[in-house]
C-alpha cells in the first residue's frame, strides 16, 4: 500500500506506484581521488507508468504532454553519527526537513548546498522543500513518507514501503570486497545483510538486502 500524489500544473494526480526502492549507496573511484566517506546516500526511488497527460482532452493543448513520473533522492547523505549501535532500525529516527538551499541541514549541522532529491514529471524537478520520514515495519522493510514542492511548483505527497537494500561500488580497483564490507560495517552490522560481490571489469559491486527476521 502507498500513494504517489502530485499537484502538477494545478491538476491533482493520484498515480500508481511501481518499483519502490529504499537503498543505501556508496562508492569509491567514481571520479579521480574519490574515496569512501563518513556518510552514506539514502536513495529513495519510486516510479509510475509513463502516460499522456491531457486533462482537457485536447492533444494540442499547451498542458498536454507525456509524463514519466518518478522520485529519486540520490543526493541525500546520512552521516555516520546517525547510525546507532550498527542497527538498521535506527534509520526510523532519521527525519529530513529540507527548506531550500542555504537553510540548515539538521542531519549534518551545516547548510544544505544542494537539493537532496527530485521529482520527475515532463522533466526533472528538484526539491525546493521536502520533509521525509521513515518507519521500520519489521523483516528488513521500511515505510517512507515524503511531502514537499519542487522548483516548478509541483507539490508531492508520496508514501511507499520496500525492503532495505545496499549498493556499494569500488570503481577502477579502488576497493576490495573486504574493504567495502569493513567500511559498511562502521554504519550497520554487515551480519544483518545478505551481500553478494560481482566483478565487472575493474569495477566491484557489492549488492544485497537486509535479512528478514532481524
Place the predicted regions along the sequence by residue.
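Short, well-ordered strand-loop elements centered on a beta-strand within folded domains, enriched
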Residues: 37-39, 141-147, 173-183
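Compositionally biased, low-structure terminal segments
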Residues: 5, 25, 52-54, 143, ...
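Acidic, glycine-rich flexible loop segments
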Residues: 90-167
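A short, surface-exposed beta-strand/turn
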Residues: 152-180, 201, 205
